[in-house]
């Protein structure tokens, strides 16, 4: 599955243990991660200023994301009204790249639910969908991913 992880999901994964870290590991292990330069720039700032993560850890995490993801940049902004204009560029990048799911904790984006072919899910919704799909796949003799 083509997945775009929003800044808040990546920041939580890098700075804390828990669901977002599990989501990031699963996406790295079994899916195709898409990311934009905007998200990487936001992530650097959030990790440094909000979470007070060391510069070495920030550099390592950004390097990992750059190495193991597909670049996604916006072509045209969708005709959607959002308070945060930066979120429009993130949605546009995901749509332009043909991403299936945008995983975010941003309530305004989550309220949209879907834009074009892009489904917008919370980390919990995404995780539950993955686990449901894995159970179905395991029942048909398909490999079950575990991370």
Predicted features and spans:
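Glycine-rich, phosphate-binding/catalytic loops in enzymes
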Residues: 20-23, 52, 119-121
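Hydrophobic/aromatic ligand-binding patch that stacks against planar heteroaromatic rings
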Residues: 63, 93, 112
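Short, well-structured N-terminal submotif of metal-dependent ribonuclease cores
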Residues: 1-35
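Acidic, PIN/NYN-like endoribonuclease modules and their adjacent C-terminal/linker elements
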Residues: 36, 107-147
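Short active-site oxyanion
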Residues: 30-33, 98-100, 118
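Residues that scaffold the ATP/ADP-binding catalytic core of kinase and kinase-like folds
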Residues: 12-14, 46, 112, 129-130
